[in-house]
Swiss-Prot record:
Organism of this sequence: Chlamydomonas reinhardtii
Domain (Cytochrome b5 heme-binding) ranges: 83-148
Reactions catalysed, as given in the entry: a (7Z,10Z,13Z,16Z,19Z)-docosapentaenoyl-containing glycerolipid + 2 Fe(II)-[cytochrome b5] + O2 + 2 H(+) = a (4Z,7Z,10Z,13Z,16Z,19Z)-docosahexaenoyl-containing glycerolipid + 2 Fe(III)-[cytochrome b5] + 2 H2O; a (7Z,10Z,13Z,16Z)-docosatetraenoyl-containing glycerolipid + 2 Fe(II)-[cytochrome b5] + O2 + 2 H(+) = a (4Z,7Z,10Z,13Z,16Z)-docosapentaenoyl-containing glycerolipid + 2 Fe(III)-[cytochrome b5] + 2 H2O
Segments for region (Disordered): 1-25
Record motif Histidine box-1, residues: 227-231
Transit peptide region: 1-47
Entry function: Fatty acid desaturase that introduces a cis double bond at the 4-position in 16-carbon polyunsaturated fatty acids that contain a Delta(7) double bond, resulting in the production of 16 carbon fatty acid (7Z,10Z,13Z)-hexadeca-7,10,13-trienoate.
Mode of membrane association: Multi-pass membrane protein
Protein name (record): Acyl-lipid (7-3)-desaturase, chloroplastic
């Protein structure tokens, strides 16, 4: 993700600000009537796809008799349900929310949207998840055509082949018992131990140095345990995953906003200029993509971005509060967010402010606190910005010239090959050591294909992914070290800052962004 300015106050939390681009301007348009949405949907080009994963037949619950038509987000006949759409069928999730093995907080992400890609990319055995879904009440006459459609990972021949080999060669059947969600416990203890020790040092003597050391701990939390926990990949116990995810709040972020921004928007639509908020949320300050309009100052962004990166943490704060008030991150609406989750956000913010500002000010005075807090904010921000930004912002993942990556992204989000998209739009660097310190974010390709698998398994999975891509002639991007990919990122930012705007070549639009 472009964590660099993901919730920029300058770029704006509202869709109107993003409307400076032709693609994102859809977010500011009035909501289309149902008939209009259907007409837009019909313009999508259809292409042949791989045979989807076979799902065992399950006994389906009788459809609920409800009136036809209506707006599923506003009409009472639909809003009383916790509805989701999977492969063209609407289901009521209410009976299953508290029984979901991954926890209700994860299933909430599916409410109010087509969650096909979420379901299929989060389950190593998607046939089991689909079978359970088919036991839920079906909402008859639900206006499915009014819901922005989701990509379908199971229709990707590449993704199916990789997943099958991962199940057989890496987990050998143990995924049935949840082995794929474990293995990172040692890393969690290391991260928490370091963060606790640095906080003790910070409260003992608050100054820029101890603040910077604590900032490294905050960044390490952001890269590893909160990230893995919010994906439900730290443990087979959803409570553990939730607690690890909440460390994001203590470190200064928001686990709730992260899940919608990162998992609903970025992961499903990686590097899509209209649907991945990491592409456009820093605009107009930073231009991460040549499909965005070009301003004169973008030619210098590879220089001045380093003056912006230290303020990423402050951007998080502004963006999280704005999203809470507007019920929307830049790229995803909080349809399923519960009142408890919202209250947790507020409590987490207050706890963070007390730990970083309140207690040190009480112990050492405001001057010492400000110096220490500045060290924390700047260090955490720079580490997160630099580490996250390189994964999707190099020439291989966002080429300025024609090629397979641009061809894939020029298709509509619904019809493009989802598995191929994740490979083409992500880049890896380093190996096992980088995997430990970044929570698997250095192996970004594997993380995007399997977000719900513990990062400790990514090195083994990467060999399978590289082999399957080689067999099909699909580019697989890997840099040897972080400095190497970081240097290429800087050069890319210079190149894209000077590049002319490229039109988006898509045959038709498939959704109203304001309802995504």
């Amino acid at each position: 993700m472009n964590a660099t300015m993901q919730r920029s106050a300058v770029a704006g939390r509202t869709s109107g600000k993003v409307a400076t681009t032709a693609r994102a301007s859809s977010m500011a348009r009035p909501r289309l009537p149902i008939a209009g949405r259907v007409a837009r949907r019909s313009a999508v080009t259809v292409r042949a796809v791989a045979e989807p994963v076979v799902v065992d037949k399950a006994v389906e619950a009788p459809a609920k008799p409800v009136p036809s038509g209506g707006d599923p987000w506003e009409d009472e006949k639909w809003t009383k349900y916790k509805w989701t759409v999977y492969r063209g069928v609407a289901y009521d999730l209410t009976p299953y929310l508290d029984r979901h093995p991954g926890g209700r907080w994860l299933l909430n992400l599916a409410i109010g949207r087509d969650a096909t890609a979420l379901f299929e990319s989060y389950h190593l055995r998607p046939e089991v998840a689909a079978s359970m879904l088919k036991r839920l009440p079906v909402l008859a006459d639900f206006p499915v055509d009014a819901v922005p459609p989701s990509p379908r990972p199971n229709d990707s021949e590449l993704y199916n082949a990789i997943r099958e080999r991962v199940r057989k060669e890496v987990f050998k059947g143990t995924e049935i018992k949840g082995a794929h969600r474990s293995g990172s416990e040692g890393a969690a203890f290391a991260v928490l131990g370091y963060a606790a020790a640095m906080y003790a040092l910070y409260t003992y003597d608050a100054n820029p140095l101890t603040g910077a050391l604590l900032g490294l701990g905050g960044a390490w939390i952001g890269l590893t345990i909160q990230h893995c926990g919010n994906h439900g990949a730290m443990s087979t116990n959803p409570v553990v995953n939730n607690l690890m995810g909440l460390t994001n709040d203590l470190a200064g972020g928001s686990s709730l906003m992260w899940r919608y921004h990162h998992q609903v928007s970025h992961h499903i639509h990686c590097n899509d200029d209209a649907l991945d908020e990491d592409v456009f949320s820093a605009f107009p300050m930073l231009r991460f993509d040549d499909r965005l309009p070009k301003a004169w100052y973008h030619q210098f962004q590879h220089v001045y971005m380093w003056a912006l990166f230290p303020f990423l943490q402050l951007v998080f704060q502004i963006g999280d509060w704005q999203a809470l008030l507007t019920n929307r991150t830049v790229g995803a609406t909080l349809y399923g967010a519960s009142n408890f989750e919202r209250q947790t956000l507020i409590a987490g913010k207050l706890a963070h402010y007390f730990l970083l500002y309140g207690l040190p000010a009480f112990l050492h005075g405001p001057t010492a606190m400000l110096g220490g807090a500045a060290g924390y904010l700047f260090t955490q921000s720079i580490v997160l910005a630099a580490t996250f930004a390189v994964s999707h912002n190099v020439p291989e993942t966002k080429p300025l010239d024609p090629g397979p990556t641009r061809e894939n992204l020029d298709e509509s989000a619904v019809t493009r090959d989802w598995g191929v998209q994740q490979v083409l739009t992500s880049a890896n660097w380093g190996g096992v050591i980088g995997n430990f310190f970044t929570g698997g974010l250095n192996l970004q390709i594997e993380h995007h294909l399997f977000p719900a698998i513990s990062f400790m398994h990514y090195p083994a999975i990467s060999k399978i992914v590289a082999d399957e891509c080689k067999q099909r002639g699909i580019p697989y991007s890997h840099y040897d070290t972080l400095p190497e990919i970081l240097g290429r990122f800087v050069r890319y930012m210079k190149e894209v800052g000077a590049a002319p705007q490229k039109p988006v070549k898509r045959d038709g639009e498939m959704l109203m962004l304001s309802k995504f």
